[in-house]
UniProtKB/Swiss-Prot annotation:
Its main location: cytoplasm. GO terms for cellular component: cytoplasm; endoplasmic reticulum; Golgi apparatus; nucleus; perinuclear region of cytoplasm; TRAPP complex. It is found in: Cytoplasm, Perinuclear region; Endoplasmic reticulum; Golgi apparatus. The gene is TRAPPC2L. May play a role in vesicular transport from endoplasmic reticulum to Golgi. It comes from Bos taurus. GO terms for biological process: endoplasmic reticulum to Golgi vesicle-mediated transport. This is Trafficking protein particle complex subunit 2-like protein. Keywords: Cytoplasm, Endoplasmic reticulum, ER-Golgi transport, Golgi apparatus, Transport. It comes from the Eukaryota.
Amino acid sequence: MAVCVAVIAKENYPLYIRSIPTENELKFHYMVHTSLDVVDEKISAMGKALVDQRELYLGLLYPTEDYKVYGYVTNSKVKFVMVVDSSNTALRDNEIRSMFRKLHNSYTDVMCNPFYNPGDRIQSRAFDGMVTSMMIQVC
């Protein structure tokens, strides 16, 4: 099950972080923050090839004993990070990709909102509801 979903701006500050359960929120914030180094490393390793790709899924960034951290980057260099419970072995790579595509589509809807200023924290109820349903659906 996805236990944390984060949207990170191009300048590496959080636009949105949602975690379940909330008692481990600081732990998940730390995991998301440390994964940004791996994201930057993968992006720089891809170099120009990243621009030509339509699929911006970075895959597994790093596993821990209890969790796996996955990444995705948009064309505008906004990063999506998802922390998944390692005990859920039924969750496949293509399901993670699908979750990131849903997240990207919902993020695009937020960006198209004329009342949203790019770079501000995401406070959209529709976006939050989509993330919550995505986290519950995977359970």
